Curated annotation (Swiss-Prot):
One of its GO terms (molecular function) is transmembrane transporter activity. The chain crosses the membrane at residues 6-26, 51-71, 105-125, 128-148, 182-202, 219-239, 245-265, 270-290, 303-323. Its main location: membrane. PANTHER family: MACROLIDE-EFFLUX PROTEIN, MAJOR FACILITATOR SUPERFAMILY (MFS) PROFILE DOMAIN-CONTAINING PROTEIN. Keywords: Antibiotic resistance, Cell membrane, Membrane, Transmembrane, Transmembrane helix, Transport. Belongs to the major facilitator superfamily. Drug:H(+) antiporter-3 (DHA3) (TC 2.A.1.21) family. This is Macrolide efflux protein A. It comes from the Bacteria. GO terms for biological process: response to antibiotic.
Length: 323
């Protein structure tokens, strides 16, 4: 598969969020977020089911894979802000940072385990069976959300402005009213703009610069995910720390120092590069987890869908620009 095709498929993974995010945020705030999450998971499951059936009879055409990636991205664009918006309705305010830390730890476990499990399954099962597992996961997620009682916003949703465009603009207006959160959004955008190109080069650095093999790439990725796991657990354990802006500052500093050291390493410095990757992973929860918790605490629940969709959209736009 050519690099242009790989890039196209990567763009399909997050461009829908970047383009449609602000409009999706309005829908998330207008309607029952529980139903939105269930619907998003079922859409992802349906798209995966189509691939499963087609893969059973023929080799999957690239255009179909790209369409399914687009549909999955739309589903994620609904699910992610809805999930972030309902979290403060379920978790006490003083526990939001801890919750974000543990959530990032679970995510990092999937980064560590998924490649190994995927390689094992691919060696013993057909592709359609592997895709079916993904479909099953989406169905299980829908059932899980269905049985969880999520408080509704009630009258606050009904009081939303009927003007769709004005509601979209309210997301930015709410952010601009809180100068600290707006500054944090700008920092996050710059963070994505700088880090994403470097992250995309990690496999190339491992293979070409350090004269490595695919095993070296795996070691680097596992190191990053392991650091992220430890960072998430630490944030979960000590999430009540009050000076959270200090945590974000320390996270950016750790990331910057690690990237600088990585850029100065000789070709014999792969081990140090692995250590730097672990430190980078360690720093991530103290930025993204704390940022999410701050938004959840400072923004009223009826605006959270629009705010999280808007921030996700802006950061998603920063990714291709940085690349």
């Amino acid at each position: 598969m050519g690099s242009a095709m790989v890039l196209s498929m990567s763009l399909l993974g997050f461009l829908p969020y970047a383009v449609f995010g602000p409009a999706i945020g309005v829908l998330v705030d207008r309607h029952d977020r529980k139903k939105i999450m269930i619907g998003a998971d079922l859409i992802i499951a349906a798209a995966g089911s189509v691939l499963t059936i087609v893969a059973f009879y023929m080799e999957l055409p690239v255009w179909m894979v790209m369409i399914v990636l687009f549909i999955r991205s739309i589903g994620t664009a609904f699910h992610t802000p809805a999930l972030n918006a309902v979290t403060p309705l379920l978790v006490p305010e003083e526990q939001l940072t801890k919750c974000a830390g543990y959530s990032q730890s679970l995510q990092s476990i999937s980064y560590i385990v998924s490649p190994a499990v995927a390689a094992l399954l691919y060696s013993v099962w057909e592709l359609n069976a592997i895709i079916a597992i993904d479909v099953l996961g989406a169905v299980i997620a829908s059932i899980t959300v269905l049985i969880v009682r999520i408080p509704k916003l009630g009258d606050r949703v009904q009081s939303l402005d009927p003007n769709f465009i004005r509601e979209m603009q309210e997301g930015m207006a709410v952010l601009r009213q809180n100068k600290g959160l707006f500054a944090l959004l700008l920092v996050g955008t710059l963070y994505m703009f700088v880090y994403m190109p470097i992250n995309a080069l990690f496999p190339l650095i491992s293979m070409d610069y350090f004269n490595g093999t695919p095993v070296h790439i795996s070691i680097t990725e596992i190191s990053f995910a392991s650091g992220m796991l430890i960072g998430g657990l630490l944030l979960g354990l000590f999430g009540n720390y009050q000076k959270r802006i200090l945590l974000i500052t320390a996270s950016i500093f750790m990331m910057g120092i690690s990237l600088t050291i990585s850029g100065l390493l000789p070709q014999s410095g792969f081990f140090i590069f692995v250590v730097c990757s672990a430190i980078m992973g360690l720093s991530v929860p103290f930025y993204s987890g704390v940022q999410t918790a701050l938004f959840q605490e400072k923004i009223k629940p009826e605006y959270l869908g629009r705010v999280f969709s808007l921030t996700g959209s802006i950061m998603s736009l920063a990714m291709p620009i940085g690349l």
